[in-house]
Amino acid sequence: PPEAHNMRKLLLTFVLALALCVPSLAAETWNVGTWKTAQTIQPFLYAPFADGAAVKVHPFTNPGDQKAALLAGSLDMTGTTLALAIQAASRGEPIVLVASLGNKCSALVVRKDGGVKSVADLKGKKIGYVPGTMHEILLRETLTRAGLNPDRDARLVRIDFFDMGTALSRGDIDAYLSGEPLPTLAKRQGYGEILAYPYYGEGIGAINSGMIVRRDFVEEKPERVMEMIRAHRKATEQCMSDKAFWLETASKMFGVELDVLRDAADNMELVW
């Protein structure tokens, strides 16, 4: 209905203004890290739920850099992949997982007309990935299920998420496994095809990313951590209850065509 559309536009304008403007007289500032993607958008939407706190969002492209910034004290909370969070905790690093961020969003993409028709055809091929991410774990699981040894039967090439499309279109790699909207973009722009969605009921599953804080931050400021988690929950629920608002906001914030996000939406899930 026109009324609902107008209300959504008004709310979208309000959220965008809050995300871009940091009040100078706020009692406290939350420094939060995340990626500039639709499936990790929640921190950009905390402001209406922050009870007067200023929210400064720091976008990253690599989960390792996010964790390093958190441990250095530059961030109060940050998104990261669950693989990296588990790895960090196993090493005794002082991080605490306080919320989920997103579940599924991954896809295995191959070069169009590159001759790869099945995962088994990736033997000897160059595959782009980001180490220490859930995408790496899902890639390794997918190759193993097809009878390939990830370390011997394929050449895994470290490439930043946002460089994968260019590398595939140029022929520098034969495939990559990454999150949306890159797989959908590759398909729509004609240089790639989605070979598989790497989710298997009896395997790793659709887990992907979460929010972490430093242990000392939890111990010293437990109430602030709870406030941040509440804002995270409300931002997540807002997006999941209003899919149009979520995708329209992501499109405007991150410069991704709305139709691309609509095509990718079934492969993205926000959680808290």
Language-model features, listed with the residues they occupy:
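Periplasmic-binding protein-like
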Residues: 101-110, 192-218, 225, 229, ...
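Short helix- or helix-capping micro-motifs
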Residues: 186
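Bacterial N-terminal signal peptides
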Residues: 13-23
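Short, glycine-/small- and polar/acidic-enriched structural segments
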Residues: 28-151, 155-161, 167-170, 174-180, ...
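Secondary-structure end/capping motifs
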Residues: 219-272
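Short, Lys/Arg-enriched N-terminal segments with co-localized hydrophobic residues
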Residues: 1-6
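A conserved hydrophobic position in a structured secondary element of the catalytic/binding core
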Residues: 80, 178, 213, 220, ...
